[in-house]
From Swiss-Prot:
Described function: Involved in disulfide-bond formation. Acts by transferring its disulfide bond to other proteins.
Family, similarity comment: Belongs to the thioredoxin family. DsbA subfamily.
Principal subcellular localization: periplasm
GO cellular component, one term: periplasmic space
Cystine pairs: 57-60
Signal peptide from the UniProt entry: 1-27
Name of the protein described by the UniProt record: Thiol:disulfide interchange protein DsbA
Keyword list, A-Z: Disulfide bond, Periplasm, Redox-active center, Signal
A Gene Ontology molecular function term of the record: disulfide oxidoreductase activity
Gene that specifies this protein: dsbA
CDD domains, A to Z: DsbA_DsbA (cd03019)
Amino acid sequence: MLSSSISRLLAAAALAATTFFAPASHAEGNAYVTLSPALPSDTPGKIEVLEFFAYTCPHCAAIEPMVEDWAKTKPEDVVLKQVPIAFNAGMKPLQQLYYTLMALDRPDLHIKVFNAIHGERKRLFDKKAMGDWVASQGVDRAKFDAVFDSFSVQTQVQRANQLAEAYRIDGTPSFGVGGKFLTSPVLAGNSYEGAIKEINKLIPMARAK
């Protein structure tokens, strides 16, 4: 059972995560923010699209199927990188969950986590609850436990936090494009579809600049 302090942290995180990213200033009429200076890429030779998300965020859950569909048709020189966000210490296990699933080669469970939390109302907020759930999905529990606390996963969590700070993310979902632009559903007219369309518009701009 979650302690009251952790429950309060997660409640605060859920509130933060449901707020679309709203930058302090951006060009009037634009559905994106220009990053200055541009941020370096972790994937040389590719245009990175960074999807900043939180499993506690219902907007992230809603847009994720659209992101998955978009990823199937994205240009060859574009790579999608999903970046789990922690707005407080109580959310770190959710970051670890994402990277553990990727390390165990179970990306299919990524969208199922959203459904478990938002659709089935499962409280996947600590290692035990997460381990029980992934075991029900056919994941070896011992492997999950070992990877969850591994140095590799901890390193990836640290990198996710660095990226969130560099992009000044204060709400989800948000999308970084080529290290040069940032967009979100709220910037794109409070529209999930609009955000996906804006990503497609920004990719050629990222190539050109």
